[in-house]
Structure formats: C-alpha cells, structure tokens
C-alpha cells in the first residue's frame, strides 16, 4: 500500500513541475483586432471591474460609445501594432511580459489627437503599464490600476 502511494506521488510530480503561471502573450494580444468596449474608473483591478465612463443611459454617453467602440487596435506577433480611431490611423510598437503582466506601448509619429476621444485613446495606450485578460477580453491599466481601458473582439 505504501509503495503504491509513493508511485502515485511520483507520477503526479511531472505534472506539477509543468504548471506555468505565465501568460501566452501572443495568444492574448495578437489574437485579432481589438475594439474598445469602454473606459473604466474606480477600478478594482483584481476583480476586473470598474465604473464605466460612458453609459448608454444618456444621449451623451450613447454618442461617445458609438464613436469609441469603433476604435480598433491590432497587435502583430512581430511587436508592431496598428490602430484606428476617429478620422485616422496610427502605428506603433508593443511589448508585453507574460510573467508579471506588464505592457509597454509606443505610438510612432504624431497621431491625430484633435478630438477628445482620440486623445483619450492615445493617452490610455501610452500610459498603460499592466494588462490582464485572454483572447476574448483585454484590459490595459496605468501604474496605479485605478482605471483601465477594456477591449473585446467584434
């Protein structure tokens, strides 16, 4: 009986060693085109929730959501990215670390930030330091993690 228990434990050990808590960064980021869902404040980063900035319960919120949900971001496996926003596109680079879930995004050139929504988008991207999510939902947050931008695939 004792020998049997030891054998079972030895059989389980390789599975325990193979566990990996590191994210597959490419699977998450480079899984297609991402679209903004909303911006969130009063965030509880660990519980993945917050207070949506734009709400469909009023005309101003509906108009903002109509605009920002068309903003897109495509992360490519080679570390480049392409984004779309109101009246323009931009390119840049990205880098993420799956172990500590950090992200760094650089926007090349001078993207069109003449609209408040464009500026908000670019600022959220360039200030992002942390990410969480999977191949369906992606959240990017600044250092304090008190707010975040959330993306989804259409």
Across the structure, where does each feature detected by a protein language model lie?
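Sec-dependent bacterial lipoprotein signal peptides
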Residues: 1-18
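Lipid interaction determinants
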Residues: 17-154
């Amino acid at each position: 009986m004792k020998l049997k228990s030891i054998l079972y434990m030895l059989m389980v050990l390789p599975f325990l060693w193979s566990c990996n808590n590191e994210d597959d960064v490419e699977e998450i980021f480079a899984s297609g085109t991402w679209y903004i869902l909303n911006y969130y404040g009063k965030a509880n980063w660990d519980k993945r929730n917050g207070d949506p900035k734009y709400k469909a319960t009023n005309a101003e919120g509906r108009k903002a959501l109509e605009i920002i949900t068309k903003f897109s971001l495509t992360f490519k496996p080679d570390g480049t990215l392409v984004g779309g926003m109101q009246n323009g596109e931009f390119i840049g680079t990205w880098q993420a670390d799956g172990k500590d879930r950090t992200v760094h995004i650089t926007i090349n050139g001078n993207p069109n930030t003449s609209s408040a929504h464009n500026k908000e988008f670019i600022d959220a991207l360039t200030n992002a330091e942390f990410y969480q999510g999977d191949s369906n939902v992606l959240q990017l947050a600044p250092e304090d993690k008190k707010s975040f931008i959330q993306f989804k695939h259409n």
